[in-house]
Regions:
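Conserved, well-structured core segments
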Residues: 294-296
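Long, low-complexity, intrinsically disordered segments
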Residues: 300-315
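Acidic catalytic motifs of isoprenoid enzymes
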Residues: 1-169, 173-189, 196, 200-236, ...
Length: 315
């Protein structure tokens, strides 16, 4: 996917880093088993977070073993054994990658289009394996959602909120797939907020290039100013506020995940929410400049940790 949903490694504890690496590498191995070895090339931080959230929702236990892999043949690494949560994320990743490549073939030019055309047959094979494994309804849902999103983007609607919500709804349905009741509702909320945040941040990240090559960008349609080839400082501040608001909504959803007996999983999710994602906002909107997102995230994390400790003490 996009690679924005990542940890900030310097702030992870050693055991949290090991847990995260086990899930990341375990997802990679599961993708190879479920959708073919080529699918491992589409491994992303984004679906690693999806896997972590699914583990929190389902309460699945991880079995971690030290293994070698093709990418790291000399040294064994902690690697989670396949679980239903990892398998679901493997299939969802393959299906979404297929429609993302189709989107690139339609919209991109030059080397990006050539690259998409080269990988398209392999990605299509991954998607077919997912359908054969019983995920045809997921495939149909992604197809319809992406079709609706493409039609909305083609209309060049002067809004970032509507396409962001459509993408968020898609992510929510993927994350909630197969769940019921409160778990499904919570998964959908987490996916919705993550999807909206990713869509808005990606639009900001691609703004200058999209304007240069006259590609669709929801922010360019919203601002409707052909002379604005780059986001102005004022627009960047507006986007920062909007993205932090999405993180605040996501915080409320993360707070409902039952991770009381899994401190490593809790610590990783907290790190991504309060350290990793704010730093992605800083990187995309302000480059190396300091905008206060990371400091604000750290402050919210300290408040979150205090609230959690009180809750655990009373539990």
């Amino acid at each position: 996917m996009y690679g924005y949903l990542r940890t900030h490694a310097p702030e992870l504890k050693v055991r949290e880093q090991e847990y995260y690496r086990a899930v990341y590498c375990g997802l990679c191995r599961t993708m190879g088993k479920c959708t073919g070895q080529c699918s491992r090339m589409t491994l992303s931080y984004d679906f690693t977070l999806f896997a972590l959230v699914r583990l929190a929702l389902t309460g699945e236990d991880l079995t971690v073993k030290s293994r070698r892999c093709v990418a790291h043949p000399l040294r064994k690494r902690p690697m989670a054994e396949p679980t239903p949560a990892l398998a679901l994320c493997a299939y969802a990743s393959a299906i979404l990658a297929h429609y993302k490549v189709k989107d690139d073939l339609r919209d991109e030019r030059g080397l990006k289009r050539t690259a998409a055309s080269v990988v398209a047959p392999f990605i299509a094979s991954m998607r077919r394996r997912s359908v054969r494994k019983g995920y045809g309804d997921m495939d149909s849902g992604v197809y319809l959602a992406m079709k609706e999103l493409c039609e909305l983007e083609a209309s060049r609607i002067p809004s970032v909120d509507e396409p962001a919500t459509l993408f968020g709804e898609l992510m929510g349905k993927l994350l909630a797939y197969g769940l019921e009741g409160n778990e499904a509702k919570l998964a959908h909320t987490v996916g919705l907020r993550l999807g909206r945040w990713v869509y808005i941040l990606d639009a900001a990240d691609d703004y200058a290039e999209d304007v240069k090559y006259r590609r669709y960008n929801p922010l360019a349609c919203l601002y409707a100013d052909p002379s604005m080839t780059e986001l102005t400082p004022h627009k960047r501040e507006e986007l920062k506020i909007a993205l932090l608001a999405e993180l605040a909504e996501l915080e409320c959803a993360f707070d409902l995940l039952d991770t009381a007996d899994r401190p490593d999983l809790r610590g990783i999710l907290s790190n991504i929410l309060y350290e990793g994602m704010p730093r992605q906002i800083e990187r995309v909107l302000f480059g190396d400049g300091e905008c206060g997102c990371a400091r604000e995230g750290q402050g919210r994390k300290r408040h979150y940790d205090r609230r959690r400790r009180k809750g655990d003490d009373h539990g």
